[in-house]
């Protein structure tokens, strides 16, 4: 959605990395796309349907268009230093399905915790799959590394919310990364929309679908689902 003013600089850094192959940029608002030659770079594939296809369909699109054994799903307002890509490139993923970002210690669930002077620490999670992952102080939807073989196509019933939960509930070996080299804010794009916007209406529909269908363990009792299950859209 091009809300991050430094995005083109981020892309330049990623293109310079020997550990980054193809970069698939899903343009959900072509009218706001900045003018930059970086989009002509050989590593970048710019995809635009002329409208906002929303978060989870964009993830699925990236999966379809990629050919790497290891995928990075990354929000435009998150910056990942090259050392992280190097770390992931050298990591044995044999017993790893999915890696997300650590939030523990944050004052809220909207900021990635900075761990200064800390080496990268990979922690295996005993995830409570009966609760949404965001409420457990881990961020997967903003930055995650997942094996191609572990990715599952997210149903079109869920277009903004619950994509990370869908993947997590279908993965066995789930980890989180403590690091000072992934920075940014969470949900910055979502909170920019007013309550009557199509985005907010879509969030309500996602929640209603999570209540109605059986894609998630215990989702009928999730606070987010309860909040919107009877709301008009």
Please give the residue ranges for each predicted region.
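Short beta-strand-to-loop acidic/aromatic patch adjacent to the donor-nucleotide binding site
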Residues: 68-79
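C-terminal catalytic/acceptor-binding lobe
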Residues: 157-233
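Glycine-rich, basic loop-to-helix element that forms the pyrophosphate-binding segment
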Residues: 49-66
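Short beta-strand-to-loop element that shapes/binds the nucleotide-sugar donor at the catalytic cleft/hinge
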Residues: 99-116
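A recurrent flexible, glycine/aromatic-enriched loop bordering the glycosyltransferase active site
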Residues: 124-146
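Conserved donor-nucleotide/metal-binding helix-loop-beta segment in metal-dependent transferases, i.e.
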Residues: 85-98
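Short, well-formed alpha-helical segments that are part of the catalytic scaffolds
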Residues: 2-16
């Amino acid at each position: 959605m091009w809300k991050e003013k430094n995005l083109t600089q981020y892309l330049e850094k990623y293109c310079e990395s020997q550990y980054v192959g193809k970069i698939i940029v899903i343009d959900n608002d072509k009218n706001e796309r900045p003018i930059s030659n970086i989009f002509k770079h050989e590593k970048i594939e710019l995809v635009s349907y002329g409208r906002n296809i929303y978060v989870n369909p964009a993830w699925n699109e990236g999966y379809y268009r990629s050919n790497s054994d290891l995928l990075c799903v990354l929000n435009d307002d998150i910056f990942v230093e090259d050392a992280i890509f190097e770390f992931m490139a050298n990591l044995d993923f044999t017993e790893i399905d999915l890696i997300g970002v650590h939030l523990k210690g944050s004052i809220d669930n909207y900021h990635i915790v900075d761990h200064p002077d800390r080496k990268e620490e990979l922690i295996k999670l005993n995830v409570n799959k009966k609760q949404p992952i965001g409420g457990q102080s881990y961020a997967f939807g903003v930055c995650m590394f997942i094996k191609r073989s572990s990715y599952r196509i997210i149903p079109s019933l869920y277009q903004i919310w619950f994509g990370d939960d869908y993947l997590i509930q279908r993965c066995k070996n789930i980890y989180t990364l403590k690091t000072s080299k992934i920075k940014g804010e969470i949900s910055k794009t979502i909170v920019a929309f007013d309550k009557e916007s199509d985005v907010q209406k879509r969030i309500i529909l996602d929640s209603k679908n999570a209540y109605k269908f059986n894609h998630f363990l215990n989702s009928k009792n999730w606070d987010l689902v309860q909040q919107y299950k009877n709301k008009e859209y």
